[in-house]
Swiss-Prot record:
Induction pattern: During regeneration of liver.
Binding site for Zn(2+) 1: H290, D302, D364
Gene: Cpq
GO molecular function, one term: metal ion binding
Described function: Carboxypeptidase that may play an important role in the hydrolysis of circulating peptides. Catalyzes the hydrolysis of dipeptides with unsubstituted terminals into amino acids. May play a role in the liberation of thyroxine hormone from its thyroglobulin (Tg) precursor.
Location relative to the cell: Endoplasmic reticulum; Golgi apparatus; Lysosome; Secreted
Species of the source: Rattus norvegicus (Rat)
Protein name: Carboxypeptidase Q
Length: 472
């Protein structure tokens, strides 16, 4: 009988979500899904107030103007740079002046790499200066540079097939762009795979959906036991040109010179501000973006926009005189571009309280006009998030997609905390990503207003609901 009872409970649990009779537990309380739907529906007026203030009202364009002031003043914010630390101190002051609570800096250790002077020139079959951007963490060349013949390949499979041709050469990858997740492996692993077959350097076709002769930088990693070789990204145009030349049987020779250096790790800070919860202050909805960037462009899109709509979300809640039941916590991460370095240390520092995190949110895919929210969590939590997103019907942004994305929140998501990220126009995003084109010109104030409204509504409602989002 005991077994049959538990079997009955399991069956009811499995089928009840669609019927509106799912049981959620918070302490000793039991609530049906219908009751939760009704609770969320009661936030309609609050959601409209947030939308009106952000998109049509007094504070429209505020996140855009705040962002422009920072990036025009400071510029790009590479991990380990003085620019990044200047930006952190400015944001620390800004958040205090904005009237947010518990504003503080949490110290972390981060990498310090500088690209130095760099150049690449094709000297055979003709003289042609290549636009390049060294990849983060790359070693430099000898002072005199490297002059070597080129081997062009379209994939790692082709590289292995032609391994006997690679020794002493510069491997040029002309991999096709499918999507970022699949194509970025060439940037991440290109140098290692080339070094394994004896190459002296690697040049990788930029991981981008479109190019107007623009190289795109990014993170790459070396592997223990494999020689380190210099590595950089080149433009799509030059990669395709060299592929055509090679297919005709032309010999290609490049002179590569890179002054990149890695210095000892240095101190930096994650920047934190809150609106303290009124009823469950120890419980948290985390809203975030990263403050660091690469050393090209202004870091406006990646990830100034995400950081500033996250700040704007708390500002909007504060400006409306709202105080959610649980704490809204803003975190502006440092050293995300080096693999979530600041976020990993935040996780280690705070994971003892993991049961108190209802939702972790990160905006790091641009702040163009969002089409919805990407979400990772239990089926119960997803059903709740669909109801929350229905409050954004006035903006026609109500969809909930699978798989929240965010280097900085993945630590929490993998540990079972529900996670959310903006669903954005990634095709357009990769026009500018990690390039000199990542400037305020890529930003649209009206689209930032909408993104901030979506972010604020979701964060506030989840933070103010009577119960935390249920986990698996």
């Amino acid at each position: 009988m005991r077994f049959l009872f538990f079997l009955f409970v399991a069956v009811v649990h499995l089928f009840s979500l669609g019927s509106g009779k799912a049981i959620y537990k918070s302490g000793v309380s039991q609530r049906t899904f219908q009751e939760i739907k009704e609770e969320i529906a009661n936030y309609e007026d609050v959601a409209k107030a947030i939308i009106n203030l952000a998109v049509y009202g007094k504070y429209q364009n505020r996140s855009y103007e705040r962002l422009g002031l920072l990036v025009d003043t400071v510029g790009p914010r590479l991990s380990g740079s003085k620019n990044l630390e200047k930006a952190i101190q400015i944001m620390y002051q800004n958040l205090q002046q904005d009237g947010l609570e518990n504003v503080h800096l949490e110290q972390v250790r981060i990498p310090h790499w500088e690209r130095g002077e760099e150049s690449a020139v094709m000297v055979v079959p003709r003289i042609h200066k290549l636009a390049i951007l060294g990849l983060g963490g790359s070693i430099g060349t000898p002072p005199e540079g490297i002059t070597a013949e080129v081997l062009v390949v379209a994939s790692f499979v082709e590289l292995q097939r032609r391994a006997s041709e690679a020794r002493g050469k510069i491997v040029v990858y002309n991999q096709p762009y499918t999507d970022y997740g699949k194509t970025v492996q060439y940037r991440e692993r290109g140098a290692v795979e080339a070094a394994k077959v004896g190459a002296v350097a690697s040049l990788i076709r930029s991981v981008a959906s479109f190019s107007i002769y623009s190289p795109h930088t990014g993170h790459q990693g070396y592997q223990d036991g494999v020689p380190k070789i210099p590595t950089a990204c080149i433009t799509i145009e030059d990669a395709e040109m060299m592929s055509r030349m090679a297919s005709r049987g032309d010999k290609i020779v490049i002179h590569l010179k890179m002054g990149a250096k890695t210095y000892p790790d240095t101190d930096s800070f994650n920047t934190v501000a809150e609106i303290t919860g009124s009823k469950y202050p120890e419980e948290v909805v985390l809203v975030s973006g990263h403050l660091d960037s690469w050393d090209v462009g202004q870091g406006a899109l990646d990830d100034g926009g995400g950081a500033f709509i996250s700040w704007e979300a708390l500002s909007l809640v504060k400006d409306l005189g709202l105080r959610p039941k649980r704490t809204l916590r803003l975190v502006l991460w440092t050293a995300e571009e080096q693999g979530g370095v600041g976020a990993s240390q935040y996780y280690e520092l705070h994971k003892a309280n993991i049961s108190k995190y209802s939702l972790v949110m990160e905006a790091d895919s641009g702040t163009f006009l969002p089409t919805g929210l990407q979400f990772t969590g239990s089926d119960k939590a997803r059903a709740i998030m669909k109801e929350v997103m229905s409050l954004l019907q006035p903006l026609n942004i109500t969809k909930v997609f699978n798989d929240a994305e965010g280097t900085d929140i993945n630590f929490w998501i993998q540990a079972g905390v529900p996670g959310a990220s903006l669903r954005d126009d990634l095709y357009k995003y990769f026009f500018f990503h990690h390039s000199h084109g990542d400037t305020m010109t890529a930003m649209d104030p009206k689209q930032m207003n909408v993104a901030a409204a979506v972010w604020a509504v979701v964060a506030y409602v989840v933070a103010d609901m009577e119960e935390m989002l249920p986990r698996s």
